[in-house]
Amino acid sequence: MEYINRFYWLIALCLIISTGANASVNPKPFVIPELKEWKGSDGAFVPTEATKIVYAANNPELERIARIFAQDYQTMFGRSLEVVQGKGAAGDFIFSLRADKKLGKEGYTIRVTDRVALSAPENIGVYWGTRTLLQIAEQSENHQLPKGTLRDYPDYPLRGFMIDCGRKFIPLSYLQDYVKTMSYYKMNTLQIHLNDNGFKQYFEHDWSKTYAAFRLECDTYPGLTARDGHYTKKEFVDLQKLAEQSYVEIIPE
């Protein structure tokens, strides 16, 4: 009987130790889309006034991504982070390029220890990684990041959305904001439907009576554009350039 009691006490002790060990491991952070791989450790990285954003290579695009991250961080959290080139140290965000065939073109790795090391095979992966960092940081008052290692990559090369501006004019400012929102959630394609007729059921089911809207400026037929709103060529090109900076492709049709 004494042997059995000792056996049960031993099992209970193992369960307690196991539960305590698991409790100290950080769970997978909530990110949209869901992270592919996560190996948690314990503790958290908390940015300080001395935290810098360090890009590790003489790469103009990597520097641009670092500055976009700094700008977004300032906008979202009200804290200014210095952007520098170098190796980085404890307390810093460190961005670098590193070959990894398993990650593909858009994948990335983030290791959170006493620093945050974000690496990817290509610049676009680093950019998507910054969106993940912002999403996680947004979820706590001190913008901490749980310590651990994550690897992430998309399931689909095209992650898109189509918006109908033909039947209903949508202001340019809304489209600009929409591009930024799409990029935040790693969507990379926006198809803009520019020309169409209204739904015929509202016009006696007669297509010839429906309102035909052409939303993009036309040099060949200057009077063709819709009376209730359109985009100039320059406005639309500028929108496409803005989207490119966030790795979003705009497809007009």
Language model regions located:
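Bacterial N-terminal signal peptides that target proteins for export
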Residues: M1-W9
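Short amphipathic alpha-helical "recognition" segments used for binding
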Residues: R6, G78, N195-N197
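A ubiquitous, low-specificity "background" feature that marks scattered single residues
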Residues: Y8-I11, I170
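Acidic, contiguous N-terminal accessory segments
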Residues: L10-L13, A21-P154
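Feature activates predominantly on carbohydrate-active enzymes
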Residues: K102-E253
